[in-house]
Amino acid sequence: METEVKKIPYLDLKAINEPYEKEIKDAINKVVNSGWYLQGEAVKKFEKSYAQFIGTEYCISCANGTDALKLMLMGELAIGNLQKGDEVIVPANTYFATVLAISSVELTPVLVDANIDTLQIDDRLIEDKISPKTKAIMIVHLYGKLAWTPKIAEICKKHHLLLFEDNAQGFGCSTTLSDDSQNTSEPLSKRRYTGNLSDAAAHSFYPSKNLGALGDAGAVTTNNKDLAEAIMALHEYGKIEDGIFRYQGVNSRMDEIQAAVLNVKLQYPENEQKARHRQIQLYLEHLDDDIKDRCIAAKLISPAHENVFHVFPFLTRKRDQLKGFLAENGVGTKIHYFRPPYLQPCYPEMNHLEFPVAKRIADEELSLPCNSSLNDEDIIRVSKLINQFLV
């Protein structure tokens, strides 16, 4: 009789949330029993706690990460820092929602190719894309890897550009800054978290994120009071007081249950990150050296605090075959993302563009299991299977 092979899922959300199960249930019951399900104490507590964690003056919660991106841009439009038709530079290999948020508020996304060593926007290519219409750069901490660089901050300062962060995948990621090159007036001399490296940042708490809710949720962080006040109004129809609407806004609110869940998990910000870093080290120990050299981006791993490994991207020309082989052996994987935004049918005006690194990533990237629901034996087994297939 054959022994059944243990399945290794790409992500087991139930298992990830089990350590917090009692606290989460208690927090949800408290909300249910309160009779107050929107704009209550749980949301207020989360906004205050999250701003403190990120290090910003303001946090405005909303319904999801895509809304956070849109509200951030809508806020800048509302206070006059952006005008419709302005260009926003954005990485070509980002998730579709980043580009969608820009175009949906009548701004123009201008794509820049990625750097194959970091898988982030290539800061060497940005200035060639700047035109008189360029007013902002949107960096994306894709896969949980820091996208901010001193050069990007210098470009923003030189060309008087706003800097935005899509921090949907970057919770807990940080960098050590020692100069005043950030696009603000404040000198920097200590470590800062992503979400506080720019004029404003959008965050997602989709269940699979490193800080995940039990449904959709998002937020914007900023140190700009005028922007924060505009977003506070915009996310509730544009209302500035009962019955008075300054803007044509949207209805995008985080509910009390999601806030209660996030308040529990925000008490343990290191748990998921530590598990993922340990597993990355196991992959590095057990994957063959030549495979690591060929398939792991050269600057992906270190320094440790600059990557929280929301995704562990593995590059191989045999991506589809490896994915199938791992599936046959009970290992779940994902692809982030097989068709980049500029090749999507809803952007026909971009379909002719060429971004060779972004296209290579789209063709070769395979996301390997890496999260707190897995144990050491799981990671070692996945590594051995990869070695076996790519020998």
Which residues fall in each region the model found?
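PLP-dependent aminotransferase class I/II
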Residues: T3, K14, D26, V43-K48, ...
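A glycine-/small-polar-enriched, mobile loop at the entrance of the PLP active site in fold-type I
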Residues: L11-I16, K25-K45
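Phosphate-binding glycine-rich loop
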Residues: W36, G40-E87, L100-V105, L111-D113
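Hydrophobic residues in well-ordered beta-strands that form the structural core
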Residues: V90, L111, L163-E165, I335
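Conserved coil-to-alpha-helix start sites within the AMP-binding
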Residues: N93-V99
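Helix C-cap/helix->beta junction micro-motif
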Residues: V105, K158-H159, N329
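Short beta-strand->loop structural element characteristic of the AMP-binding/adenylate-forming
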Residues: T108-T118, K334
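Active-site phosphate-binding strand-loop segment of PLP-dependent enzymes
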Residues: D117-A213, A219-T221, S367
